[in-house]
Curated annotation (Swiss-Prot):
Residues the record marks as carrying a glycan: N72, N154, N198, N212, N326
Protein name: UDP-GalNAc:beta-1,3-N-acetylgalactosaminyltransferase 1
Topology, Lumenal side: 44-331
GO molecular function, one term: galactosylgalactosylglucosylceramide beta-D-acetylgalactosaminyltransferase activity
Organism of origin: Mus musculus (Mouse)
PANTHER family in UniProt: BETA-1,3-N-ACETYLGLUCOSAMINYLTRANSFERASE, UDP-GALNAC:BETA-1,3-N-ACETYLGALACTOSAMINYLTRANSFERASE 1
Length: 331
C-alpha cells in the first residue's frame, strides 16, 4: 500500500499545479484581451496649451456656497489669506492648525487670515458629522463650503471655489496661499519671505515641478487618462502642498478657469491656467523653503522652512511647540 500512496501524492500535486497554471493562464489571457480592447491613444510630445482653451466660458462653476466665513473680508485688506483644503471629517486636523500656525492673525502688523475649504460629505450625509460641522462653523467661522461632493477627484472644484471666494468676498488680499491639512507652515517665515520680495504683482511660487511626466498606471491615484490629459509632460506648476500667488492674479486665473475644463489634479490645472496667461513660476533661490516629501526635520530646519508636507495633526502641534522654544541654532 505504501508505494501506491507515494505514487498518488505526486500525481495529486501535479494535478494541483496544472490547475493553478491553467487558472493563471486564463487570468493572463483575460488581462491581455481587456488591455487590447481598451482605446489606445498616442501620447502627444509637444505641448500646446491652447488645446485646453475654449473661447466661450463654458466651464464656469455655479455651485452654491452652503457655509461662508464670519468675518467680512471684503472690508479688510489682509496681507495674506491662507486657504486650506480639508475633508468634512478632518476635525482634528483643522483644530491642530487653529492652535498652531493658523492661530496668530497678525505678524509684525500684517494681517494673516486662515480658512478651510470643504465640499459636501461624500456618499450619504452623516447627520452627526453635518451637525458637528455646523457647530464648528458657528464657533470658529472659518469654513468655506460649496455643495459639490467632497472627493479626491473634486479637489479641483475646491480650488475653483477658493478663487471664486477670494474674488467675491476677499478681493483686497495682497497674497493668497493654497495648502493642505497635512502641511506644516512656518507662518512667520512665509510673511518675511513675502515682505522681502522685490515685486508683488504677477507673482507665483511654491515647490516647482518642471517637466513632470503624466502617470498612466491605472491603479494608482496619480493616474490620469489620455482622454483627460493627452500630453507626455505636465506644464510647469507648483505642487499643491502650498503655492502662493499675488492677489492681482486671482481674478485673471479665475476668469481663465471658466475657459479651461477642470482636470483631476488641481495644482496641474492651476499650472495650465497660468501657462495660458503666460505667468512664469518664481523659483526660490533657497531650495530649503518647500518640502514636497516627508523628511526628518529638526527644530532649526523647521525655523527656516515655509512649508513641509506629510505631517499628522499631532506632529504639527508637537513641532510647533518645539519650534517656539528658545533653542539656539548655529546654522
Amino acid at each position: 500500500m505504501a508505494p501506491a500512496v507515494l505514487t498518488a501524492l505526486p500525481n495529486r500535486m501535479s494535478l494541483r499545479s496544472l490547475k493553478w497554471s491553467l487558472l493563471l493562464l486564463s487570468l493572463l489571457s483575460f488581462l491581455v484581451i481587456w488591455y487590447l480592447s481598451l482605446p489606445h491613444y498616442n501620447v502627444i510630445e509637444r505641448v500646446n496649451w491652447m488645446y485646453f482653451y475654449e473661447y466661450e466660458p463654458i466651464y464656469r462653476q455655479d455651485f452654491r456656497f452652503t457655509l461662508r466665513e464670519h468675518s467680512n473680508c471684503s472690508h479688510q485688506n489682509p496681507f495674506l489669506v491662507i486657504l486650506v483644503t480639508s475633508r468634512p471629517s478632518d476635525v482634528k486636523a483643522r483644530q491642530a492648525i487653529r492652535v498652531t500656525w493658523g492661530e496668530k492673525k497678525s505678524w509684525w502688523g500684517y494681517e494673516v487670515l486662515t480658512f478651510f475649504l470643504l465640499g459636501q460629505q461624500a456618499e450619504r450625509e452623516d447627520k452627526t458629522l453635518a451637525l458637528s460641522l455646523e457647530d464648528e462653523h458657528v464657533l470658529y467661522g472659518d469654513i468655506i463650503r460649496q455643495d459639490f461632493l467632497d472627493t479626491y477627484n473634486n479637489l479641483t472644484l475646491k480650488t475653483i471655489m477658493a478663487f471664486r471666494w477670494v474674488m467675491e468676498f476677499c478681493p483686497n488680499a495682497k497674497y493668497i496661499m493654497k495648502t493642505d491639512t497635512d502641511v506644516f507652515i512656518n507662518t512667520g517665515n512665509l510673511v518675511k519671505y513675502l515682505l522681502n520680495l522685490n515685486h508683488s504683482e504677477k507673482f507665483f511660487t511654491g515647490y516647482p515641478l518642471i517637466d513632470n511626466y503624466s502617470y498612466r498606471g491605472f491603479f494608482h491615484k496619480n493616474h490620469i487618462s489620455y482622454q483627460e490629459y493627452p500630453f507626455k509632460v505636465f506644464p510647469p506648476y507648483c505642487s499643491g502642498l502650498g503655492y502662493i500667488m499675488s492677489g492681482d492674479l486671482v481674478p485673471r486665473v479665475y476668469e481663465m478657469m471658466s475657459h479651461v475644463k477642470p482636470i483631476k489634479f488641481e495644482d496641474v490645472y492651476v499650472g495650465i491656467c497660468l501657462n495660458l496667461l503666460k505667468v512664469d513660476i518664481h523659483i526660490p533661490e533657497d531650495t530649503n523653503l518647500f518640502f514636497l516629501y516627508r523628511i526628518h526635520l529638526d527644530v532649526c530646519q523647521l525655523r527656516r522652512v515655509i512649508a513641509a508636507h506629510g505631517f499628522s495633526s499631532k506632529e504639527i502641534i508637537t513641532f510647533w511647540q518645539v519650534m517656539l522654544r528658545n533653542t539656539t541654532c548655529h546654522y
